[in-house]
């Protein structure tokens, strides 16, 4: 029987393959990003304790107030969101992370997010 959505199935397979290699620890937690059609979501996770240290989304009122955007579905919003996440992570004392792209291609919004976070001093 064929899978209903081959693109989604392939992304999940890529994500499992990536997760075998990308592990967050207390010194370098994992920065996981999920792009939906209209928004972006990011979490900083310590995999050894299985705890989410910080979570962010473009739906948050704080981000929408700073950016003036209602949706985070484009590259410009991804750049602003990457800077926002890096600043908030620094406030929590997190400066080094392991980047988890979640099986999505390192292109477009994912690349813009990562480059903006690096510009603000988040190292990965």
Positions of PLM-derived features:
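Ribosome large-subunit tunnel/peptidyl-transferase-proximal elements
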Residues: 2-124
